[in-house]
UniProtKB/Swiss-Prot annotation:
GN (gene name): dpp4
Classification via SUPFAM superfamilies: alpha/beta-Hydrolases (SSF53474), DPP6 N-terminal domain-like (SSF82171)
Function: Extracellular dipeptidyl-peptidase which removes N-terminal dipeptides sequentially from polypeptides having unsubstituted N-termini provided that the penultimate residue is proline. Contributes to pathogenicity.
Protein name: Probable dipeptidyl peptidase 4
Top-rank taxon: Eukaryota
Organism of origin: Aspergillus fumigatus (strain CBS 144.89 / FGSC A1163 / CEA10) (Neosartorya fumigata)
Length: 765
């Protein structure tokens, strides 16, 4: 086993860290309990997220205080003014958006959740002088899907019944009329929301507010999947379940088609814009961005069906002519949709306009400047590390602020880079292990710097070019004080060397009052999906994993291992799992368990593995290896066969079923020997109302196992009525963790040769 040693080197060139470079272990005697970690998060750091606004003074933001009042505060002077008093806030308000000149507030009320990001609501416009409220749509009934101010504030675009409307001066124009169950205008359908856009809207105003670009999705021909709801939010079940008919394209099935539309607000003229980057049936639009300061150019980032080819198509709004200005081939793996395109404008003396984007075309995700007119891009950053986020673009100072893994893949430090000189400057001490983020004011003169771990998070306010904080925004002093009463598990990080020479990041959590002379059971907690990351030096929530390391009757070590295919270690590390999901990931988890078993403080006979979603799938693939390295498996909401999952996620990593039939067969969980032989058995948990990873996955897997003769001693199954992928309906979440705790306790106490019922004894069969 190869262990990496973290060396802390002093640095005086950037902001110092007033916390320790490791997770806290507490200084008291109390142990965390189940109720404090699962039923409620008794000790949880807080952080503010501000909505910066443009006023005459940089540094103003809007927030809603504890009594419900909407207020504007200067983060510099702390001066506060009330925009809407609490008694004037509409009843059942869910969210709000401020008019650009602060004259009005757009409120969402009567919230009803739909999918991961989407919801329905009523919307009201409130004049801040008179405090009068007027409905966005007079006959609304909690059925508006999205609404957004234009940048100039003279219009609101909104979506209702899958149609786009524009409100101006109390007058509403309906822009589309064909919206319905199969046609979506301005909002994504289920698969685009979940897998491509990662949001609930699909419309974008031009910077000057003169045009609106929106996407139109056509689900005609997309197969329907039925999700039954047995209780349907009632205390007594109805005689017949409600059935959700969800257009859900699975592998190699028909995908929705997508079309770009442009609306000129002055004339009300709407124009469909053909994007011929790929065949219409193959086309995926991953991103739409205005590459202009006004409304001259709108660009589309287009992918082919399996997302291993990419084209950026720029549309000249005046002529409606389109041109491919950038192209990528990613057939060595896949191309991620990072949603990071942003307009920069002319650079230096040149009149040529550029936009910025994150691309891994060098093998590592970095910042690139691309000409809006097309041509060779310019690399702003380079090296064997990755840019993870663009936080702010400061055009007057010609700077881009970003987060990266420059120090280590498990860390995030804050930097700026000049697009004039390409000089990279750390804003924090990047030699100290940490995870940071930042939020910049509207004019870029100030920023809230958020320390996110490994110690207790906090937030400070800084002025640009200053290394001394103006003040502390969030100290989390209450958390620091609370931790003085507890003794906490000890979290450490190291790297594990594979025989190939590659390394895996590992996060180890040692039990409270750990003794190297004792032997402890271990729980592996992988996610392991493509591009994901679980091993991070961010603050680790005091959750279930902290509980099982604290309970004196459990005292589990936990190992979280980021296997090959996970993120932030370069394209080659990610893409080697392409077309063969489950193979390398499982091999890496087994290898890590075998190395853990050699440690003197590990009980090698009791090493369990538990994962949720992709982690549940990976747990199944690990058990399927029949390696003997793990003694118990728990699969929560797992995929069991990639033919059952949605096309846009699955084909990105596995290609189509027709082109990779052998890969799909190998990736499915079908081998039962490991399930028969795993010493402590397997627990499978799934919600029947899961609209993401369908219950079908667990049902088919259980049928395979039962049909192949896996015995009741080896297999336990738990469904959760009407629960979605998060398993929370009617107390499901607490039950799930109690059940998991029980299985871990039983596994710890399990003897290798216990008594069994006669049907388990081969001699009497």
């Amino acid at each position: 086993m190869k262990w990496s040693i973290l060396l802390l080197v002093g640095c005086a060139a950037a902001i110092d860290v007033p916390r320790q470079p490791y997770a806290p272990t507490g200084s008291g005697k109390k142990r965390l309990t189940f109720n404090e970690t699962v039923v409620k998060r008794a000790i949880s750091p807080s952080a503010i997220s501000v909505e910066w606004i443009s006023t005459s003074e940089d540094g103003d933001y809007v927030y809603q205080d504890q009594d419900g009042s909407l207020k504007i505060q200067s983060i510099v002077t702390n001066h506060t003014q009330t925009l809407v008093p609490a008694d004037k806030v509409p009843e059942d308000a869910y969210s709000y958006w401020i008019h650009p000149n602060l004259s009005s507030v757009l409120w969402a009320t009567n919230y009803t959740k739909q999918y991961r990001y989407s919801y329905f609501a009523d919307y009201f416009i409130q004049d801040v002088q008179s405090m009068k409220l007027r409905p966005l749509a007079p006959d609304q009934s909690g059925d508006i899907q999205y609404a957004q101010w234009s940048p100039t504030g003279d219009a609101i675009a909104f979506v209702r019944d899958n149609n786009v409307f524009v409100w101006t001066n109390a007058s509403t124009s309906q822009i589309t009329n064909d919206g319905g169950p199969d046609l979506f205008n301005g909002v994504p359908d289920w698969i685009y929301e979940e897998e491509i856009l990662g949001d609930r809207f699909a419309l974008w105003f031009s910077p000057d507010g003169a045009y609106l670009a929106f996407l139109r999705f056509n689900e005609t021909g997309v197969p329907t999947f039925t999700v039954p709801y047995y209780m349907d939010n009632e205390e007594i079940a109805p005689p017949y379940p409600r059935e959700l008919e969800l257009r859900y394209p699975k592998v190699s099935q028909t995908n929705p088609t997508v079309e770009l539309n442009l609306l000129e607000l002055r004339t009300g003229e709407r124009t469909p814009v053909p994007i011929d980057a790929f065949d219409a049936k193959e086309l995926i639009i991953g991103e739409v961005a205005w590459l202009t300061g006004k409304h001259d150019v709108v660009a589309v980032k287009a992918f082919n069906r399996v997302q291993d080819r990419q084209k950026v198509v720029a549309v000249d709004v005046a002529s409606l002519r389109s041109k491919t200005i950038s192209e990528r081939d990613g057939t060595d793996g896949w191309l991620d949709n990072l949603l990071s395109m942003a307009y920069i404008g002319p650079i230096g003396e040149s009149k040529e306009e550029y936009y910025i984007d994150i691309s891994d075309q060098s093998g590592w995700a970095h910042l690139w400047l691309f000409p809006v007119a097309g041509g060779e891009p310019i690399a702003l950053t380079k090296g064997e590390w990755e840019v993870t986020n663009i936080l702010s673009i400061d055009k007057p100072r010609q700077l881009v602020y970003f987060l990266s893994t420059k120090h280590h893949s498990t860390e995030r430090h804050l930097y700026s880079v000049s697009w004039k000189t390409k000089e990279i400057t750390p804003l924090v001490d990047d030699t100290v292990p940490a995870v940071w983020s930042a939020s910049f004011s509207s004019q870029g003169g100030y920023y809230i710097l958020s320390y996110r771990g490994p110690d207790v998070p906090y937030q400070d306010l800084y002025a640009i070019n200053s290394t001394a904080p103006l003040r502390t925004i969030t100290s989390n002093a209450a958390v620091l004080n609370a931790l003085k009463e507890y003794t906490l598990p000890n979290i450490t990080y190291f790297e594990l060397a594979l025989p190939s020479g590659e390394t895996l990041n590992v996060m180890q959590r040692l039990p409270v009052k750990f003794s190297p002379k004792k032997k402890y059971p271990v729980l592996f907690t992988p996610y392991g999906g493509p591009g994901a990351q679980e091993v991070s030096k961010a603050w680790q929530a005091l959750d279930f994993k902290a509980y099982i390391a604290s309970d004196p009757e459990l005292e589990y070590i936990t190992w979280t291992v980021d296997n090959r295919g996970t993120g932030y270690k370069g394209r080659a590390f990610r893409c080697q799992v392409a077309s063969r999901l489950g193979e390398l990931e499982a091999a890496d988890q087994v290898f890590a368990a075998q190395q853990a078993a050699k440690l003197p403080y590990v009980d090698a006979q009791h090493i369990a593995i538990w994962g949720w979603s992709y982690g549940g799938y990976l747990t199944g693939k690990v058990i399927e290896t029949d390696s003997g390295a793990f003694s118990l498996g728990v699969q929560t909401a797992p995929v069991s066969d990639w033919r059952f999952y949605d096309s846009m996620y699955t084909e990105r990593y596995m290609k189509t079923l027709e082109s990779n039939a052998a890969g799909y067969n190998a990736s499915a969980i079908r081998k039962v020997a490991g399930y028969k032989n795993v010493r402590g058995g397997v627990l499978i948990q799934h919600g029947t109302g899961d609209d993401n990873v369908h219950f079908q996955n667990a049902a088919a897997l259980v049928d395979t196992l039962v049909g192949a003769g896996v015995t009741p001693e080896k297999l336990q199954v738990q469904w959760f009525t009407d629960s979605d992928h998060g398993i929370r309906y009617h107390g499901g979440n607490v039950f799930l963790y109690r059940q998991l705790s029980k299985r871990l306790y039983e596994e710890k106490k399990r003897k290798e040769k216990g008594e069994a019922h006669q049907w388990s004894k081969k001699s009497v069969l």
